Design a protein with these regions (language model features):
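ASCE P-loop NTPase motor core, strongest for the SF2 helicase catalytic module
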Residues: 2-33, 47-49, 134-375, 394-412, ...
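Accessory nucleic-acid engagement/destabilization modules that flank
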Residues: 1-149, 157, 266
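A short helix-loop-helix "switch/interaction" segment in the helical subdomain of ASCE P-loop NTPases
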Residues: 379-388, 418-424
Length: 756
């Protein structure tokens, strides 16, 4: 009976759960409860098993304490201490050579010691913006260690993604805003062309100024970014993209007046070394309306995106920004600084007030001598003085202006192929066009040598007719000026509700481009027009062909724009076409989800077209990009395109609004607008008097080294599909052989790895 009871007890004592009750030999406990002979000896682990455990040990944790070192006869407190020693692991910062403020901080007096830079200046790839002067050991002993300047090093999180030209740009910006390039001046103009990463460079500048300085403390405590309303969300996303959770910007893109005032007051009232939301992102319109709140305190830095809108010092936006209490000002403009002396003065005066003197001093010292020297009747002395003053002006401006062209992108981006496609008008368009020229008052007045400002709005009618007759059908029904008696020209039973692409040369070509692209590739397409009515036609075409599409125009809210763009850029999105109003969202949008873009109609302002065409060929693009600029051959569209390409001061060839046409066109030039050359394959090519073409056929290729930025005379000229690098346009030319008359085409740079 006793043996039967003892056996189960013996078995239980050998179980793993009873390990704590067993005592080692020679222990202080009673020997009768301890039976060493009953304990099975542990199996020795092989060396391979031990090595396998060590191989997968994380570098950021120490090995667990081995259980074999367990002390005998633990009480509860000893046991808890033992478990804590097993689970403990030292914290290790994953950033190499990090010298940040995460170490232990003691209350009380500040401990003496040598000041250190926030980031290691000797680390490989470090971007050092400031290097303190080297001191001898003797000088270091004499100087106060608490006052020694330190290196300013860009955060490695950012410096490792900056390209060489961006590193150079960040250094230039930092030197300008810290008054190291021009003593006493703290502003600069970032005028890089589109796609060179101006936003990233400015974010790097802000983050550096907010975190460090040679004095071992932040240079600024707050920064304000002012941008067009369509880019507020984009700036917010970019800050999050590059800085992650390290900073929380405040973006204001809507709300009531009281709500916005409350947010701005909260932003301005922030104080201390670590401001919770040190970056404010706000639109120009909201800034202008609420500048009173922002004037109540000081701001360390203001950045004005799309800053070319500040070229007029008389407008309210300029004056509101100029009243802000900050000397550090950065103006971003991807648009070329226009060759207008007054604009030079306004922009430079905004960022660095007084560097060019007052407006009167500037006019006397620079403007008048330069203009006088340019005059055709200028004396040799005047011409020499004008050139001298121009060189002086450029030397001053270049100290606070940095501009790099997009040819830098050729190192990082795939090839871009630009194609100017001249399309023949259909018989319906031709007849309507000719009737309008015969009947419209503007044409009649110009033939008589008169020019009426009010009647020049009919230029819009011609431009819309070039897009599609459906856009002027209502004018024909109502028999508006120039379209009297034209209703009978339309086909029997015609209705503008249903789109008929074959009635427009450009729409027919677009229909083929979309169809070939859809059937032969996975490419997506961006369609751009100046008119929302034309976007309506695009919608009808997409619905008829069952293409999935998204549309962005002035009616879409800023929040929804960001969602639409993000969805379209997602590779898994089924959307094929992105319709864009150039007036509503031409600037700042990143549409790298598409690699084909069609400019359906030209704008008077070349900057608007350039902005729109840069939406797809930008950082992050992986495919070869194809840009199509569609023009109706021999019409007003070619005249507009020629004005864009003309080598004149942009102040005299850019027209912002159609009612301003009379300020920029002579009577003879206006007469040319109201003409139609039916026989011309391309009026633009005819005016080039091209020596490389014989009977409109290219015989000699363009000069070596020519690219998209070269003059049209140095592009390829084609009257057939042979020589085109775009297979889609080749196929479209086959299908619409009578619709395409001429193509100018050129690439951004030589291909390195073949077409995608």
């Amino acid at each position: 009976m006793d043996g039967a009871v003892a056996a189960p007890r013996e078995r239980r004592s050998l179980a793993p759960s009873q390990l704590a009750k067993r005592k080692p030999e020679g222990g202080p406990c009673d020997e009768e409860d301890w039976r060493p002979g009953a304990v099975t000896p542990k199996k020795r682990k092989s060396s391979s098993e031990t090595q396998s455990q060590e191989c997968f040990l994380s570098p950021f944790r120490k090995p667990l304490t081995q259980l074999t070192n367990r002390p005998p006869c633990l009480d509860s407190s000893q046991h808890e201490a033992f478990i804590r020693s097993i689970l403990s692991k030292p914290f290790k910062i994953p950033i190499p050579n990090y010298q940040g403020p995460l170490g232990s901080r003691a209350l009380g007096l500040k401990r003496a010691g040598v000041r250190r830079a926030l980031h290691d200046p000797l680390e490989e790839g470090a971007l050092v913006l400031y290097e303190p002067p080297s001191l001898s050991a003797h000088d270091q002993l004499k100087l106060d260690k608490e006052k020694l300047p330190v290196h300013v090093v860009v955060d490695p999180i950012l410096s490792k993604v900056l390209r060489p030209h961006q590193r150079e740009g960040v250094k230039f910006l930092w030197e300008c805003v810290t008054s190291r390039r021009i003593p006493g001046s703290h502003g600069c103009i970032m005028a890089d062309e589109m796609g060179l990463g101006k936003t990233l460079q400015c974010i790097t500048l802000m983050w550096t100024l907010l975190r460090q300085s040679p004095e071992c403390k932040p240079e600024i405590d707050k920064a304000v970014v002012v941008s067009p309303s369509s880019l507020v969300k984009n700036w917010y996303n970019e800050v999050g993209k590059w800085l992650g959770g390290r900073i929380q910007p405040l973006a204001i893109d809507g709300g009531s007046k009281d709500e916005i005032d409350q947010k701005l007051e909260g932003f301005m009232n922030q104080r201390g070394a670590r401001v919770p939301s040190p970056i404010l992102i706000i639109s120009y319109e909201t800034f202008r309306l609420h500048v009173g709140v922002l004037r109540r305190g000081s701001v360390g830095l203001v950045i004005c995106d799309e800053g070319h809108r500040l070229k007029n010092s008389e407008n309210q936006t300029y004056q509101a920004l100029d009243s802000l209490n900050t000397s550090r000002r950065v103006l971003i403009s991807g648009t070329p600084i226009q060759n207008d002396l007054l604009e030079y003065f306004s922009l430079v005066h905004f960022v660095n007030s007084g560097i060019l003197g007052t407006a009167q001093e500037f006019k006397k010292h620079f403007e008048l001598p330069i203009l006088k020297g340019r005059d055709a009747a200028a004396s040799e002395e005047d011409r020499h003085l004008g050139e001298e003053r121009l060189r002086e002006l450029i030397s001053i401006v270049n100290r606070c202006l940095i501009r790099r062209t997009s040819d830098i992108l050729s190192k990082y981006l795939p090839v871009k192929i630009e194609q100017v496609v001249c399309c023949r008008l259909t018989p319906l368009q031709t007849e309507l066009y000719k009737r309008f020229l015969r009947q419209a008052k503007p044409a009649e007045e110009l033939r008589e040598g008169n020019m009426s400002v009010s009647s020049l709005s009919s230029i819009t009618s011609l431009k819309k007719l070039c897009n599609h007759p459906a856009l002027i059908y209502d004018k024909c029904v109502e028999e508006e000026d120039g379209f009297e008696g034209t209703l009978d020209i339309f086909p029997p039973g015609y209705s503008s509700k249903a789109l008929e692409p074959q009635l427009s040369g450009k729409m027919l070509v677009l229909d083929y481009i979309l169809a070939v692209t859809r059937s032969c590739s996975s490419d997506k397409v961006v369609l751009v027009s100046n008119y929302t009515q034309t976007l309506d036609l695009f919608e009808k075409l997409c619905r008829a062909r069952r293409y999935l599409y998204v549309r962005l125009d002035g009616t879409m809210s800023i929040k929804k724009r960001a969602k639409v763009v993000e969805r379209f850029n997602n590779p898994s999105s089924p959307d094929f076409v992105f319709m864009l109003s150039s007036k509503a969202g031409g600037c700042g949008l990143n549409l790298i989800g598409a690699n084909r873009l069609v400019m359906f109609d030209p704008d008077w302002n070349p900057a608007n077209d350039e902005q729109a065409m840069a939406r797809v060929w930008r950082d992050g693009q992986k495919k070869t990009c194809y840009i199509y600029r569609l023009l109706s051959a021999g019409t007003i569209e070619e005249k507009i395109f020629q004005r864009q390409s003309h080598k004149k001061a942009l102040s005299s060839c850019v027209v912002d609004e159609e009612q301003d046409v009379e300020r920029h066109f002579s009577l003879g030039e206006l007469k040319e607008l109201f003409t139609l050359d039916e026989a011309s394959l391309s009026d633009t090519h005819d005016r080039l008097r091209c020596r490389r073409c014989v009977n409109n056929h290219q015989v000699w290729p363009p000069p070596d080294g020519s690219d998209c930025t070269s003059d049209l005379a140095q592009w390829n000229h084609s009257t057939d599909k042979w020589g085109l690098k775009d297979e889609v346009l080749q196929a479209a030319w086959d299908a619409a052989s009578t619709a395409i008359t001429f193509v100018f085409h050129q690439h951004s740079h030589e291909e390195q790895r073949g077409l995608h």
